[in-house]
Regions:
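Long, charge-rich intrinsically disordered scaffolds of nucleic-acid metabolism proteins
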Residues: 1-81
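Short, hydrophobic/amphipathic alpha-helical patches that form generic packing surfaces
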Residues: 7-27, 31, 103-108, 157-165, ...
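Acidic, carboxylate-rich catalytic segments that either coordinate divalent cations
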Residues: 169-251
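Surface-exposed helix-capping loop/turn segments at secondary-structure junctions
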Residues: 34, 77-84, 217-224
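Phosphate-backbone recognition surface of nucleic-acid-processing proteins
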Residues: 90-93, 104-198, 202, 215
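Long, contiguous secondary-structure blocks with strong helical propensity
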Residues: 41-49, 79-91, 143, 243-250
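Coiled-coil termination/hinge junctions
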Residues: 72-110
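Alpha-helix boundary/N-cap detector
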Residues: 13, 55-58, 62, 69, ...
Length: 251
């Protein structure tokens, strides 16, 4: 793995751990900072005892403050690293893709030297399909999803963050989502609407990731061939989607 990408991955893991601990103790020490469906829970006698014991072993207010400060510092470090990454110049114009999300995406992508094709990159990012072309998903009666090598948990979490942000803010991503969602509903009208929703999200994300994979490889001086034409990567005009399609248009 390239040293710059390794630094980003390490910083992301540190940020994630700071955030996890901060949220854990924020819920215990400062429940008023959360949005509750009802009134803020009161401090029970049991919780008071728990907090007192946690304080004795160093997990009190001072620990919470350290985690909150560490989270802010790690986030700033991740954003700075992302801004100095060669992929940033291609990500910067994408509406909905701020510096934090760019750093998180690079952390999820990991070693860009390994996936020599867009489909290999999709697999590492948890967007692969099974041999029959279906999406890995649980079926009733099965305990595990059929997938040879599942994506890392942090890759899945980052993918969800990217989907949410892009669907809210990026016009090209929104258009791709709605188009492929409608196409799925037309082909499988008997299936649950959630399947169509997830299909639209998945295809839009695969198109975005393929474009980012190409620029990332090229920015690092690596070949980025498309050995065959992916139908879903085609624009209405017949050309393949590129990262520029996701850029904010003037006016």
């Amino acid at each position: 793995m390239r040293k710059q990408d390794e630094e980003i991955l390490g910083t992301y893991f540190r940020l994630e751990e700071y955030q996890k601990q901060r949220l854990r103790f924020e819920r215990l020490l400062h429940p008023e900072q959360f949005k509750w469906s009802g009134p803020t829970p009161t401090m029970s006698a049991t919780k008071k005892i728990k907090l007192a014991e946690l304080e004795k072993i160093g997990f009190g207010e001072s620990f919470y403050r350290r985690m909150a400060d560490g989270e802010k510092a790690a986030r700033k470090e991740l954003e700075d690293l992302a801004e100095n990454h060669p992929l940033w110049e291609y990500i910067k114009p994408i509406r909905g893709f701020a510096k934090y999300l760019a750093g998180a995406f690079i952390a999820a992508g990991g070693d860009i030297e390994r996936p020599a094709t867009a489909s290999a990159f999709w697999k590492g990012m948890g967007l692969d399909v099974l041999a029959d072309g279906t999406v890995p998903r649980r079926t009733r009666g099965d305990k595990q999803t059929t997938r040879r090598i599942p994506a890392f948990p942090h890759v899945t979490r980052i993918g969800e963050q990217i989907r949410q942000q892009m669907l809210r803010q990026n016009p090209c991503y929104q258009e791709l989502y709605h188009r492929h969602k409608a196409d799925y509903q037309a082909r499988y009208p008997e299936r649950p609407k959630m399947f169509a929703h997830k299909h639209g999200l998945r295809i839009a994300q695969k198109i975005l990731y393929a474009a980012l994979w190409e620029k990332w490889r090229q920015a690092c001086g690596l070949p980025a061939p498309f050995p065959y034409v992916f139908d879903i990567l085609k624009h209405d005009s017949g050309r393949r989607f590129t990262i520029e399609d996701f850029y904010s248009k003037p006016g």
